[in-house]
Amino acid sequence: KHTHSIAEVSKFTQNFPSKAQKLAEKFWPGSLTILLPKNQLIPDLVTSGLKTVAVRIPNHPLTLELLKSLDFPLAAPSANPFGYISPTTALHVEAQLEGKVSYIIDGGYCRVGIESTIIEVQEEKTTIYRLGGISVEEIRTEIGEIEEVRHSSSNPKASGMLKSHYAPTTPFIIGDIASLSKDYDAQKIGVLAFNALQENVAEEHQVVLSKSGDLAEAAQHLFAGMRYLDTLDVEVILTELLPEEGLGRAINDRLRRAATTKK
């Protein structure tokens, strides 16, 4: 559920633990979703029968204005077909949902680029179910130790937990790009690289996420880059893992779930 203020949260939840409130005060509006026990105002249909509701205050003026105009929290699932690459612009949404929705509100490109971090705060433990725009390190700085649950094959507690997700239609392989490229026709390769172009592959068949090696910039460009490469006439998209720290962990999570093969 998306809402516009922390004060609104108590209207549709049973309790709001102090640690969760601390995180909300630090990171809202922003890329953090908190799972909280729902009250009777939230129908089971909205939460797929779960006893918790996912709550977030988004950090965009247009969305906040929309939410302030409503007298109820807004359920807002991802605007893309299940399992495909997440959209980060209104054009992405239009391309895949044209004719299926009445309106698309265009607020520009997504500034974070990847989905929110999903966390559940209970009295005895704090659990991250999806890595996202707020890093594990940032959360630990605020509330101490947390545990991670990254996969669920059935009845996931949060979105983005299935082992296969965010996937292009073109085969998508993780590994050492230079080595992998030897196995394919150079004219039929797409490359999603962290910070440098690859030799022997046409530049128009490559996306560099951040030439400066900035993880936040890489996150901004991730899904748009994957979508661009998926439109090309290539047989395979080759990619590499990023540094396993900060937002790099969330980016790598998306790459691994999207991958056809990991080498």
Language-model segments: what does each one mean?
Residues 1-263:
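Active-site-adjacent structural elements in enzyme catalytic cores
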